[in-house]
């Protein structure tokens, strides 16, 4: 499978779909998550550029917004893990087409009956 924009977009749609399923259909936590992520990124960039006070303030506010969105992030992580391991199981399952996962033991000699042989002999006599 080639990874391109469509496959990444499809995966993100699956993850958000499962997340919405777990969250009851609300996209309300996406906005603070995005704003918090952007503010944290901007704070780190400002801190690296030498503007320590504004970098700490902006990054701190962004981190607080991300921490408040922690249940949403955990839900997305759980949904992503489920999708990933489910896909991995599906791909491994399709690779083993010829291998049977259930191999019953042969019937023991004590349990076998000779009914079929006796029935055929009975039919021949008729």
Swiss-Prot record:
Principal location class: membrane
UniProt keyword Ribosomal protein present: no
Entry membrane topology: Multi-pass membrane protein
Keywords, in A-Z order: Cell membrane, Membrane, Transmembrane, Transmembrane helix
Gene: liaI
TM region(s), chain numbering: 11-31, 56-76
Entry's localization field: Cell membrane
Recorded GO CC terms: plasma membrane
Induction text: Induced, via the two-component regulatory system LiaS/LiaR, by antibiotics (vancomycin, bacitracin, nisin and ramoplanin), cationic antimicrobial peptides (human LL-37 and porcine PG-1), Triton X-100 and severe secretion stress.
Protein's name according to its UniProt entry: Protein LiaI
Membrane listed as a keyword: yes
Tree of life domain: Bacteria
């Amino acid at each position: 499978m080639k990874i391109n924009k469509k496959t990444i977009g499809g995966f993100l749609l699956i993850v958000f779909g499962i997340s919405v399923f777990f969250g009851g259909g609300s996209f309300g936590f996406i906005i603070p998550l995005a704003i918090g992520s952007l503010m944290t990124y901007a704070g780190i960039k400002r801190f690296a550029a030498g503007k320590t006070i504004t970098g700490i303030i902006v990054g701190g506010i962004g981190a607080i917004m991300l921490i408040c969105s922690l249940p949403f992030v955990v839900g997305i992580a759980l949904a992503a893990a489920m999708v990933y391991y489910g896909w991995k199981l599906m791909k491994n399952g399709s690779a083993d087409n010829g291998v049977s996962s259930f191999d019953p033991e042969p019937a023991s000699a004590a349990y076998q009956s000779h009914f079929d042989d006796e029935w055929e002999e009975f039919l021949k006599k008729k």
